[in-house]
């Protein structure tokens, strides 16, 4: 009976180690988020940009100004990055809308996180597809 328990415990340990492998390798993909030398970590919250494939210049200009002023370590989008119905259920138009919003982030090599809102998939492009993009 003890041998069976030991074998089962070893098997569970092996499964646990294998299941943690993707997390370990994913951690190498992006730089670690960490506090700076002053113990600070700045997060810029961006909510409800609701942009379309023809980006609103004012929205992009405001985002760029805030990024430059705040110098964040992380940008968090709180949903409704795009106005789904305005993209016409088109993957291409959805990608253009996302490009417009994410370009200022990419230009500054900032890390970001996304929370989806109700408008993000109303255009017929799933949240899963948007995450892959």
Explain the meaning of each model-derived region:
Residues 12-20:
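Hydrophobic core
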Residues 57-133:
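Core catalytic region of metal-dependent phosphoesterases/phosphodiesterases
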Residues 51-55:
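Short, solvent-exposed loop/turn elements at domain surfaces
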Residues 30-40, 101:
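Long, low-complexity, largely intrinsically disordered segments
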Residues 40-50:
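Active-site-proximal beta-strand elements of phosphoester/diester hydrolases
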Residues 20-29:
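Sec-dependent signal peptide cleavage junction
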Residues 1-11:
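Bacterial N-terminal signal peptides that target proteins for export
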